[in-house]
Regions:
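Noncatalytic, helix-rich "gating/capping" subdomain that lines the substrate-entry/channel surface
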Residues: 1-200, 237
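Intrinsically disordered, low-complexity linker/terminal regions across diverse proteins
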Residues: 42, 48, 77-81, 92, ...
């Protein structure tokens, strides 16, 4: 966090934030002195929150954040806010338990939310509301409201009005835009081909698990059982969310429409309390170039937009290239079922430790090897936090290995094309500031390191490119990290 005393850009960023906030508040009609007071107050209150908030590293280990607290204990622990009334007013009843993700905030809540801090809290709420509203007002305010994020990421100019209009539409109707994209640009033939690759990748994983040498048989059998139960979604969902039926577009201002839509979303969110979970619901629109594994449903999802070059092409890329692209991504998402977080969920998506103690200790030892391999690597004028990126690195390692195994089964395999495609999908164009920001918060390693470090764990890479000891990408056999 840039509130930390040792953050190299602390003064630069916070001073800029205050000045930018004063400009925004002034445009809303606040006098300079009052605007400055509010801006300084929000920084003071943010600094208080930063002392207790989870770190990026803690958020990365999300399975460890599950901390259920009985409702009686929860209410008694937080005395400065009448949470019994608040929760009952929202849900209509009190739940049995509350899941506390931020233990330090919970333990220090009364020291944060109290009468002494009330003026800071009021400024914090006011400024947050005003800054968030700038996206929906004049174009000058939109540009002014995004100045701080551009400063943080090193972006030279605001998004164009055209792109902003697209952002507004997709923010409110993401699944509708995704469904249009899927129907327009994604074909059944490509879907069938990717489904075939996914089936092959799961089969490879099952075989590799069956031959695993560091797990006991009971754990191997349960891991294979989890693979057998995995659900795969490809392309786009079959239906739109029902909530869209409650969205009515009128000639109100954009701000009023968004505010009304947010109320609808909030009501729908809390109405889901104690309802059965819809495991067919997509949490990512089809036009997004991404993919994900959902641990609480044991589901992997590949939106239509990622099923294009350089990840995949049915007609313009070879099978080896496709395995190095989308194949590795598919296997990466499968691997998340067995990373340091996903491994704590069973085949039904329930948090349930299905490992023997001895097996999990062996797994943790392998995690430490992956942490050490990346920790402290220099890039973009900063260093990698190995603990922050370990889950994604485990998935990358397992995914690349499984995809290569599948590619080798093809009669026309070309490992040079396979590895080259893997490198191509991680190309990135970004400012140094943006890369440094990601290093502090993103659970993924930088693209260049994802491309180059992971391949150096595979013996086949050295054979394919004739890499010898003394070459830049050489890694001795004893230092090559292999997990799945």
């Amino acid at each position: 966090t840039y509130y930390a005393e040792d953050h190299p850009r602390k003064s630069e960023l916070l001073d800029f934030y205050v000045a930018n906030t004063v400009k925004i508040l002034s445009d809303f009609g606040y006098e300079q002195a009052i605007a400055l007071n509010h801006a300084e107050n929000i920084v003071k209150f943010d600094a208080i929150l930063a002392q207790y908030a989870n770190t990026s590293e803690e958020w990365a280990k999300y399975a460890e954040l599950y901390n259920p607290v009985p409702i009686k204990a929860f209410i008694e622990a937080l005395t400065t806010v009448p949470f019994a009334d608040v929760i009952e007013g929202i849900l209509g009843k009190l739940p049995d338990k509350v899941i506390v993700y931020e233990k330090r905030v919970y333990a220090n809540f009364d020291a944060i939310m109290n009468e002494a801090n009330f003026e800071l809290i009021k400024s914090w709420m006011l400024v947050k509301l005003i800054r968030s509203s700038t996206h929906y007002l004049s174009d000058d305010l939109r540009i002014l409201g995004s100045e701080f994020s551009r400063k943080l990421s090193g972006t030279s100019e605001a998004r164009s009005q055209e792109k902003h209009a697209f952002d507004l539409a997709t923010d409110q109707y993401s699944q509708a835009v995704g469904l249009y994209y899927g129907h327009t640009y994604f074909g059944e033939s490509a879907k069938a081909d990717v489904k075939r690759m996914t089936t092959e990748m799961i089969k490879v994983y099952q075989e590799r698990l069956d031959k695993n040498t560091w797990l006991s048989r009971p754990t191997i059998d349960k891991a294979i059982k989890k693979l057998d139960a995995m659900t795969v979604f490809i392309g786009f969902p079959d239906k739109l969310p029902d909530i869209y039926k409650q969205f009515t577009v009128t000639h109100e201002s954009i701000y009023s429409l968004v505010a009304r839509f947010n109320v609808v979303r909030s009501h729908r969110h809390y109405a889901k309390f104690n309802e059965p979970v819809d495991k067919t619901e997509w949490h990512m629109p089809a036009h997004m170039v991404n993919a994900y594994f959902s641990p609480d449903s044991n589901t992997i999802v590949f939106p239509a937009a990622i099923l294009q070059k350089p990840f995949y092409s049915e007609t313009e890329q070879t099978k080896s290239q496709n395995y190095g692209g989308i194949g590795a991504v598919i296997a990466h998402e499968i691997s998340h079922a067995f990373d340091n977080n996903g491994a704590l969920f069973d085949e039904f998506g329930n948090m349930n430790n299905w490992w023997t103690d001895e097996d999990f200790k062996a797994f943790e030892a392998k995690q430490e090897l992956m942490i050490a391999e990346f920790d402290g690597l220099d890039i973009a004028g900063a260093k990698v936090n190995g603990k922050l990126v370990v889950s994604e690195n485990i998935a990358d390692a397992g995914g690349l290995t499984a995809a290569m195994t599948a590619a080798l089964r093809e009669t026309d395999v070309d490992l040079k094309a396979f590895f080259t495609q893997w490198g191509e999908i991680w190309r990135i164009k970004a400012s140094q500031e943006y890369q440094q920001m990601l290093l502090s918060m993103d659970v993924h390693a930088p693209g260049k390191l994802r491309a180059n470090i992971q391949v150096s764990n595979l013996d086949e890479f050295f054979d394919t490119f004739d890499v010898k000891e003394g070459d830049g990408m050489w890694r001795s056999e004893t230092d090559r990290v292999k997990i799945w």
